[in-house]
Amino acid sequence: MVIKDVKLVKVAKTPGDYPPPLKGEVAFVGRSNVGKSSLLNALFNRKIAYVSKTPGKTRSINFYLVNSRYYFVDLPGYGYAKVSKKERVQWKKLVEDYFTNRWSLQMVFLLVDGRIPPQETDLMMVEWLKSLNVPFTIVLTKMDKVKMSERKKKLDEHKKAFSKYGEYTIIPTSSVTGEGIDDLLNLISTLLKEN
């Protein structure tokens, strides 16, 4: 998939704010500070998603229109301790509504920090996606920060942790070096059936 144009078209804080569905869309979810915005910018090959040093900055569902045909959807980060219980409940309701009612959703990319073992919240997200029958792929982020001598160990660690939930594709990526970006774009292209 070659991304020719991209623009943020909707910042949704309620389901009523969602734009009308298009041919297809893919969504990106992960813990706060996992590198979602950086990964989106790497996929877009331009800086359009706001990258913050403050965890939990994305509190809405952000819809990016890609090639005037598809949405790449940035979901709020989870697992940030300084978010109130009320905000966590609101986030869960908003995201669950998106997962269950958005018929154009083709795939969720679950972003997990490749430097550390999967966190409890990552495993809970896998269980939640499975319970909602939402297809997903695991994307390891920040792999440029993992020493070459430790990469196999880290990949095996993640495969083992997620294997108890089933067999899933795991794509190692780096928004810094570009590792895995083409693999992700090729998978998205196949999902959205764009040639």
From Swiss-Prot:
EngB-type G domain span: 22-194
Pfam families (UniProt xref): MMR_HSR1
GO molecular function, one term: GTP binding
Family that this chain belongs to: Belongs to the TRAFAC class TrmE-Era-EngA-EngB-Septin-like GTPase superfamily. EngB GTPase family.
Gene Ontology cellular-component annotations: cytosol
Reported function: Necessary for normal cell division and for the maintenance of normal septation.
Binding-site list for GTP: 30-37, 56-60, 74-77, 141-144, 173-175
The protein's name in its UniProt record: Probable GTP-binding protein EngB
Residues holding Mg(2+): S37, T58
Keywords: Cell cycle, Cell division, GTP-binding, Magnesium, Metal-binding, Nucleotide-binding, Septation
Example GO biological process: division septum assembly
Cofactor(s) the protein requires to work: Mg(2+)
